[in-house]
Amino acid sequence: MDNTLVDNKYTYTKELKEWMQNLKEHKIKLFILSNSPMGKVVKRIAGELGMNYIYNANKPFLKGYKSIIEKSKVKKKHIMMIGDQLFTDIWGGNRFGVKTILVRPIASTEAFITKIKRPFEKIVLKKYYKKKGEID
């Protein structure tokens, strides 16, 4: 959620809300899978965007991902994880066996723990792009 859907002040764009509504109209089930322990904040954002949610997910561990299947009754092959953090969102999604999309963070301001991880993500991504070719 943080830096993927909303900025560090927990605000989102009108376009995001419209996109979420369009996806729902096409019968796509939407979940926020957040490591945030702030259930009230996650619940508020999810409610405003018309999404289901799981907070305190402990990504990259698999419990949160499994909860999505339990709550949605959707097969793993129909799930996609979209996130801005390589070592939580993407690694967890890949370990769980779902498709993943790594996006750029919305804001430059990040939580302390995320700031610590970003240099290591850059090392991994640099090696990946060197091997596979950069996609922009």
Report the location of each language-model feature:
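Residue-level recognition of short loop/turn positions
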Residues: 1-2, 92
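Substrate-recognition element of Asp-dependent hydrolases with the DxDx(T/V) motif
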Residues: 4-12, 16-46, 56-59
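Short, charged, surface-exposed secondary-structure boundary motifs
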Residues: 57, 61-67, 110-116
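Conserved Lys-Pro-Asp/Glu-containing loop-to-beta segment of HAD-superfamily phosphomonoesterases
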Residues: 61-86
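Acidic, Mg2+-coordinating phosphoryl-transfer loop and its flanking beta/alpha structural elements
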Residues: 82, 87-119
